């Protein structure tokens, strides 16, 4: 189901779970889980349906061979009667019985005594019956059956084969468990299996699990393969301190190959009945999805609650493309009350945007309208863009020749009526640039020159200024250079190479007075290793930072020459300032860091080793105060699809007392072929408090599995903890009962992709 992507404009201090190594590919995952399932279930019960060309069965000339103790032939009728340990074979069809009566003209086989019949994709036993071998039809009395789809098997008082794709059963028991193990069993008065549609339909059915009858249903449909189809999806059952009992019963409607919808009725004990829905569509020229939720008269909030999302995109003639992304909520607490993850529940804004764009050769143009819904009343509203028009040119790259670039933008910035104290207006920004990249195997040199002209037309001047049409023009000059040194060596019989890559980056931007310019969409960039090589310390056009500085950095790599894998990359760098930085976001801002002659030391490393091990880190050290300012370190191990262990640590100090120091542990650990442990612990060292604790256990057999999980989370400072329990049952070939645990794990544990069952 679609998830709205809220945005925290002020910068979320929460972060994703511990990193994991790149891990197995999709093909490796598929092969691994298939092999694990074979280990649990043993060999297939029947020959796969695609093992032979079944069209040959329908040809009268396809020969049959018979081995029997006695053969009787009625020449006038063209019928055979075989008796005594009869074995009849025709292509992949194999029949055993004490007596077989065969009409050669029609291909019909009558079976008055117990028999065993096998063909690709099907195995039957019965007390009596008849089979039409050329047409894949027949009837069986008191029979047992096995199909290759998901190891389906069962027994029925009467069994009718309509053709190779459709079959009907009366007084039938159905399961996907191995013979001798009937952990779950569906007993129905009537069952229809449609292999062409991949659908099973049972009427007047009892479902029994571990010899305990659980429920009766007059009618139920279920998938017998992996295709999508209309019907009930997995009901969800959960309980939490906040909501009490929480039950969802989603219904999927496969309207057409390019349309589908999901209706999600949900009952929340302490709030009431909520109705959610999603509609997806796909056409040649456009596609998209609509999503909404509505809760009338929330019992706790005493008001109607709702959420709306529209994501639409398409193509127009002459290469034009458009998209619209609209997100709205009834109130600022909606995501906190009904969201499922830390990102959703801590988000501060919802974005709505419409855009039209095109590209011709080296030109790209776009028109955009952007609005925001602020979910936190304590935060200022972001500026709306009504509209934003851009035209950008980027010339082709040709070795040894200059490359030209031009970015132009016009934007009208507006605010809701409640923000009358902040300036509104228009901004025109023009930024031409030329650079010349000289590259050799041993190094490179890239000089560049840029100009940025920004002009405003304001409804009211910036406080403290009197100019409604301020403007600013500022040039920037930079030179980026680097050298490459390498040293081949041998490590434990493996050919390797180590590189040493010094890099020097110089940038000069003269100071221009900018206090009379508004701050519409500009902020100071986060400073990590990549920031050492930026020409501007600000994002957005409202400020261009003055600069006269040199960055010196060093990178080393260890590369496996055999497979090309980069086992280790480590970098260290620092900026040396030739003068103080004068340009700030606001005149009253005074940052001690802007008066220093050197920046913090910045370091980063990444190591990806054989066996699915990944280590990754970024670090920022303040040499003036001799302390760490910021860092993130992650260690992951993902050697196979069902094993994932990750640990992470993040810290950030010195931001007006809002220190962040968090640790994150996450793991999915198999305990043999049947059990798996699942856990995550996100802990705030700064607050000495757990932000989220998740623990669970999964048990699987050949034909069913269960996952039980508990979660305890804090969703804000001073908030009461919320405890919830999630339970998931999945029955192979029938469906699942889920509380959303799979989606939750994919959101919470980085690298968790779900389990093929």
UniProtKB/Swiss-Prot annotation:
GO cellular component, one term: cell outer membrane
Keyword Signal (UniProt): yes
Signal peptide: 1-21
Localisation per UniProt entry: Cell outer membrane
InterPro entries reported for this sequence: LipoPS_assembly_LptD (IPR020889), LptD (IPR050218), LptD_C (IPR007543)
GO BP term, pick one: Gram-negative-bacterium-type cell outer membrane assembly
Pfam families given in the database record: LptD
Record keywords: Cell outer membrane, Membrane, Signal
Main localization (coarse): membrane
Subunit structure comment from the entry: Component of the lipopolysaccharide transport and assembly complex. Interacts with LptE and LptA.
Record-stated family: Belongs to the LptD family.
HAMAP family cross-referenced by the UniProt entry: LPS_assembly_LptD
Function: Together with LptE, is involved in the assembly of lipopolysaccharide (LPS) at the surface of the outer membrane.
UniProt-recorded name of the protein: LPS-assembly protein LptD
């Amino acid at each position: 189901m679609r998830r709205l992507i809220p945005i925290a404009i002020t910068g979320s201090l929460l972060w994703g779970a511990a990193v994991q190594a790149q891990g197995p590919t999709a093909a490796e995952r598929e092969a691994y889980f298939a092999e694990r399932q074979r280990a649990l279930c043993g060999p297939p019960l029947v020959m796969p349906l695609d093992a032979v060309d079944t069209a040959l069965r329908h040809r009268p000339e396809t020969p049959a061979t018979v081995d029997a103790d006695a053969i009787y032939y009625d020449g006038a009728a063209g019928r055979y009667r075989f008796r005594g340990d009869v074995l009849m074979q025709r292509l992949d069809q194999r029949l055993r019985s004490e007596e077989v009566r065969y009409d050669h003209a029609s291909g019909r086989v009558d079976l008055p005594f117990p028999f065993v019949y096998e063909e690709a994709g099907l195995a039957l036993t019965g007390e009596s019956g008849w089979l039409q071998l050329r047409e894949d039809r027949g009837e069986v009395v008191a029979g047992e059956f096995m199909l290759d789809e998901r190891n389906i098997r069962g027994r029925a008082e009467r069994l009718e084969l309509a053709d190779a794709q459709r079959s009907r059963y009366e007084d039938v028991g159905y399961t996907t468990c191995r013979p001798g193990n009937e952990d779950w069993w569906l007993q129905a008065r009537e069952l229809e299996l449609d292999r062409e549609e991949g659908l099973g339909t049972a009427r007047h059915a009892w479902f029994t699990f571990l010899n305990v009858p659980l429920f009766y249903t007059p009618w139920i449909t279920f998938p017998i393969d992996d295709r999508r189809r209309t019907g009930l999806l997995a009901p969800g059952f959960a309980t939490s301190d906040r909501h009490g009992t929480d039950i969802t019963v989603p219904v999927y409607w496969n309207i057409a190959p390019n349309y589908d919808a999901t209706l999600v009725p949900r009952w929340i004990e302490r709030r009431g009945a909520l109705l959610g829905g999603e509609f997806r569509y796909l056409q040649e020229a456009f596609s998209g999805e609509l999503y909404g939720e509505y809760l009338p008269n929330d019992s706790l909030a005493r008001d109607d609650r709702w959420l709306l999302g529209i994501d639409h995109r398409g193509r127009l003639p002459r290469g034009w493309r458009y998209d619209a992304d609209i997100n709205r909520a009834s109130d600022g607490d909606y995501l906190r009350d009904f969201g499922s993850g830390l990102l959703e529940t801590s988000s501060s804004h919802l974005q709505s945007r419409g855009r039209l764009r095109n590209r011709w050769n080296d030109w790209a143009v776009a028109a955009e309208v952007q609005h925001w819904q602020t979910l936190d009343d304590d935060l200022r509203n972001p500026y709306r863009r009504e509209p934003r028009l851009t035209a950008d040119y980027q010339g082709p790259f040709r070795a040894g020749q200059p490359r030209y670039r031009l970015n132009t933008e016009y934007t009208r910035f507006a605010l809701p009526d409640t923000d009358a104290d902040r300036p509104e207006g228009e901004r025109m920004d023009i930024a031409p640039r030329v650079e010349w990249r000289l590259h050799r195997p041993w190094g490179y040199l890239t000089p560049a020159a840029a100009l940025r002209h920004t002009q405003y037309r304001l409804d009211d001047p910036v406080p403290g200024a009197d100019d409604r049409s301020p403007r600013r023009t500022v040039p920037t000059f930079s030179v980026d250079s680097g050298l490459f040194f390498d040293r081949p060596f041998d490590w434990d019989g493996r050919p390797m190479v180590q590189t040493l890559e010094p890099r020097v980056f110089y940038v000069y931007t003269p100071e221009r007075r900018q206090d009379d310019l508004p701050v519409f969409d500009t902020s100071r960039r986060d400073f990590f290793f990549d920031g050492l090589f930026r020409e501007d310390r600000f994002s957005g056009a409202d400020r261009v930072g003055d600069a006269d500085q040199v960055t010196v950095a060093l990178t080393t790599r260890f590369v496996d020459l055999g497979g090309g894998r980069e086992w280790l990359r480590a970098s260290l760098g620092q900026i040396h300032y030739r003068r103080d930085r004068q340009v700030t976001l606001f005149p009253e801002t005074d940052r001690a860091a802007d008066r220093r002659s050197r920046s913090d030391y910045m370091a980063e490393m990444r190591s990806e080793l054989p066996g699915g091990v990944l280590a990754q880190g970024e670090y920022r050290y303040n040499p003036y105060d001799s302390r760490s300012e910021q860092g993130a370190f992650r260690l992951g191990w993902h050697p196979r699809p069902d094993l994932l262990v990750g640990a992470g640590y993040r810290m950030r100090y010195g931001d007006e007392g809002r220190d962040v120091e968090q640790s994150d542990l996450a793991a999915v650990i198999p305990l043999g072929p049947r059990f798996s442990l699942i856990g995550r612990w996100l802990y705030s060292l700064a607050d000495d408090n757990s932000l989220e604790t998740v623990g669970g256990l999964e048990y699987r057999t050949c034909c069913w599995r269960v996952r039980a999980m508990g979660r305890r989370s804090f969703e804000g400072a001073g908030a009461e903890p919320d405890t919830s329990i999630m339970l998931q049952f999945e029955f192979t070939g029938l469906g699942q009962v889920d509380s959303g645990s799979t989606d939750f794990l994919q959101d919470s544990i980085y690298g968790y992709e779900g389990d093929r069952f």
